[in-house]
Regions:
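Generic structural signal for residues positioned in beta-strands
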Residues: 7, 83, 119, 142-145
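N-terminal regions of ATP-driven nucleic-acid and macromolecular assemblies
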Residues: 130-163
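Walker B catalytic acidic pair
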Residues: 22
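Loop/turn-to-beta-strand initiation segments
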Residues: 14-18, 48
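Conserved catalytic-core segment of NTP-binding enzymes
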Residues: 26-138, 153
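Short, small-residue-biased leader/transition segments that mark boundaries at the very start
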Residues: 1-8
């Protein structure tokens, strides 16, 4: 069986960034933990572990749930979360309130846990509104504007399946 080290050495030597999406829960963190030894072989400071948070998802709907999930993720992955990303959204139904609400909750999580907010992501128009409101940049991090290129009309798509 090959570890991440083998993959990294053979294929990723010229990559600056490799992203693992572990799903944000204990199950995904356990799968990520399988590569713990490989991660420890990386240059110190080169590994960043982000918790991407959408407070509109049931498992991350309260400060307490987010803190609990972060604790579990760190235990099962055997990695320290180095930053949080506010990615609060409701897909096409997202408005400025989503980023505002995410900001308020993630700010509390950061103050309690000491884990910094590294990024805030959102659809460009919603992010622009949010950023114009004068929130504390310490709990926004670097803004990442998302432009949506593929729009899915779920009702039409589902109807098409039943035809």
């Amino acid at each position: 069986s090959r570890g991440l080290g083998d993959v990294y050495k053979r294929q990723a030597m010229d990559w600056d960034t490799v992203i693992f999406d572990a799903g944000g829960d204990a199950v995904g963190a356990t799968a990520l933990g399988r590569y713990h030894q490989d991660f420890m072989e990386l240059e110190p400071g080169s590994l960043e572990v982000f918790n991407v948070i959408n407070i509109r998802r049931p498992l991350a709907g309260t400060v307490e749930r987010i803190l609990h999930l972060q604790e579990e993720m760190q235990i099962y992955s055997r990695l320290k979360i180095t930053g949080m990303i506010n990615n609060t959204n409701l897909a096409q139904m997202t408005g400025p309130d989503e980023l505002r609400d995410g900001y308020e909750m993630i700010k509390q999580v950061s103050q309690i846990s000491g884990i910094p907010v590294k990024y805030t992501s959102g659809r460009r128009e919603m992010l622009d509104i949010f950023l114009s409101e004068g929130h504390d940049p310490e709990y926004i991090g670097t803004p990442i504007a998302i432009d949506t290129y593929m729009h899915r009309d779920w009702d039409s798509w589902i109807k098409g399946l039943s035809d």
